[in-house]
Amino acid sequence: MTGSLHYLRFSSAFFALLGFLGATIGSAATEPVPPVPADHVQRFGRGLKDASIALETSGNSKPISKSSKPFSGWPFQPLATVTPPSGSLPTSHPVDGFIAARLTEKGLSLNPEADRRTLLRRASFDLLGLPPSPEALEAFEQDTAIGAWDRALDRMLAQPQHGERWARHWLDVARFAESSGFEHDYDRPGAYHYRDFVIKALNADMPFDQFVHWQLAGDEFEPENPLALMATGFLGAGVFPTQITANEVERTRYDAMDDMLSTTGSAMLGLTVGCARCHDHKFDPITTQDYYRMLSTFTTTVRSLRSLDLNPEQTQQQLKAFELEQAGLVAARTLYEKKILPDRFEAWLRAGDGWKVKADWELLESPEWKSKAGASFRSMGDGSVLVEGKNADYDTYTFTAETSTADLRSLRLEALPDPSLPQGGPGRADNGNLGLSRIRVFAEPRSGGIRHEIHLVRPRATFEQNHGSLSIASSLDDDFHTGWAVDPKFGTRQAAIVDFETPVQMPGGIRLTVELEFQVNVRHHIGRPRISVTSQTAAPFDPESVPAEIRRLLSRINSPGNSPESLSSSERATLMSWWKTSDEGWRAAQQRVELHAKNRPKPALTSILMCGEGYPALRMHTQGGDFLPETHFLHRGSADQKRGVATQSFLQVLMKSADSESQWHWQPPAGAEYSGRRRSLALWITDTREGAGHLLARVIVNRLWQHHFGQGLVTTPNDFGVQGTPPSHPELLDWLASELIRGGWRLKPLHRLLMTSQTYRQSSTESELKLRIDPSNRCFSRHVPARLEAEAIRDTLLWITGALDPTQFGPGTLDESSRRRSIYFTVKRSQLIPILQVFDSPEPLVSQGTRPATTVAPQALWLLNNPQVREWASRWASQEGGNPRSEPDLWIHRAYQRALQRLPRDTELKASRLFLAQQMERYRTGGTSQPERMAATDLLHALLSLNEVIYVD
């Protein structure tokens, strides 16, 4: 043998023998197996001998590579300029011209067009994954005007179910799942956003080149677009071990990058790029150098969780309205400060008795402290307690004490510093902060009686972290995420005062219970609290809490020989700025401002799983870094055998000139934290003139053809290389790829183009001639009936029975009783949905270009015996119009139209009528309370189990 491709050439007897052995091994027959013909055995032996000799004489020939021998395979050639043949068909459709030319060579022709019911049902399942409604079918059958078929297609392409249907095809290719796989199979919160992106992109008919750009580098193309960031979930959808020792970090990282590259190659280029990891590709012109230089694209790409506002425009509108209202409240407070506050301040100064600094605060008798989370309290001898022991994430302190005072009007909570607290306190958080989410006060007679809650008003504090969500006012609402905090005033005494809306008056004394709830942030509890009460209203803070400048001014005007008139204008302004916090009118205006500020619209942040650079990596149980700073060439794929640093390039066979990768290299803007390598890869993949764009177009066009015609023009959609199958109609494939590019890479026009052809619309009638000449239908001489995929089967049953929930997008579920479309099931690799597996849904481990379509007993058994199917049938029976007893024919007609999109045949009508009558009688005889309902359920369940429901002609 010469050259670099190794082939085993066996005789026809060899393949006949292999076929015989395969059929024998795969059969379930119990009859004795006939002996293998002797001449076949002899020829089989000679074939093996010849093959071994050929391999031995091949010497040390190297695998094919760009450097040794240029490969001229069809996938790597530019798109051919093709003119559609003008065949003998009455149709002028270009697709039919290509198909008819091949059929003519074989002495065949297209089948006649299928009937309208079959066509609409076929198209509805193809485009929507659901059957057409009886109303839609009737409207189509009655629309005899020119263009009826085109209009029907346009209506379906515009429906939101289209994206759900075709997203499922792409998610197979993208090996999409929402867990990491392996033995722990941890969930990936936010991964479902990638699924939602695919649905939205397909419904919006996003150009396919942009669809590819965003999946590879959405964060580099449009870093502020949430949808573009969601799209990058494509790269991170693969399996990943989440328990990684230090010795495994490097190998695991190369595995993760290989998954990204291999999936990109299979899904977008139809090439098994990953086969060049350990050596030059044995069949395709891909070298290990190509592999590692392309692999370096993903050197610093990591999975990351980002919290994003998915509706920024709505948030901006809400903020605009909020700021307008807030400005009005601030203006009202400013007007009060200018027109009213000065006179009230002067009256306070003239009164004189309001100058005293310290309120008459009383420490309650025998206080008792309790911690819900189990912390302990140590008395400090000054009425305060030091909180010690367990510092749980969240806690609630309960303070109970008594007083003989019969009239209480205010309560003061002090948060004292202490050397034992972090940063000196006053909180127990690592930085010394606190977060009081709610304060509640209850009172009851000291001698016993009914306890009631006191309504707290006019909150004020020595210091607040802000005047909104972290103010003392926010400790009086029911939002546990907001509350009093004091950052950065650590290591100092802080205090808060609240007044009682109505004085608490109990002649025999009062028992008070105070609850302090801490849920603003983890471990943000007060470290040394002290509580006191007073009978004064709007009492000021004691001297220690009053700023030094204010204490100085108050002391001066209180000293003999001085009066308020001795204050300068600036001193009066300083004093009034402090005093106004005790003025009821100003506090009311300020409270309106602050309460409104608490309601400032916040973006509804949603966590999405994305892949990118410069973001915090999603942490795994890894004893090492999240990525490696460089990608190396690895000898035989071993991370222990590095052979130099790999710099980014692409597949040489898909570049017009060697080492010309610089034309696609994109330089990120200054300050960007991403490398631009993934955007460079995306630009090369979609470049139809110099890069891989022509192959990208061929691959996606082939995928569309595959799902409309049952098999692709290339039957190995993930492998266009030597090991794949060549296209049955290469000129048609190139012409369709060119049409896609000329049409701006939009897929919906291509769907329409394919489905308006006579090739698509032909019937599935078979003939002996076609079965003999075109047994596998590679010439597309007929339409081949096909079973629906697992998701479409379940969705169809839900739709027929009226149980389908059309809600789109959002988190999925593992609950099999969910009535949403099957694409919204959570894809957990260790907990796949059984019904989908029964009908051949693949495991999402690697890119899947095709699904098997098996026929096994559990499928029929599931339809007949599954409780959910029975429940759906019962639901349908309760909703179906008409009476199966008094109007059986009408009722049966409606049931057949809903389930099979046709009326029953005479024999079916007669059999169904008889079945209903017999079942009603059986249930009535057996004492069933609803014999008609039960009999109807039985018949409808039988209809759901028909092959006709899950097969499409």
Regions found by a protein language model. Give the residues of each.
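Post-cleavage N-terminal segment of exported redox proteins
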Residues: 27-31, 40-84, 168, 179, ...
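Sequence context surrounding c-type heme c attachment/ligation sites in exported
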Residues: 220-327, 543-548, 836, 848
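Extended extracellular/luminal ectodomain segments enriched in beta-structured repeat modules
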Residues: 404-410, 506-513
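Short beta-strand-plus-loop segments that form exposed binding edges in beta-rich domains
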Residues: 415-417, 515-522
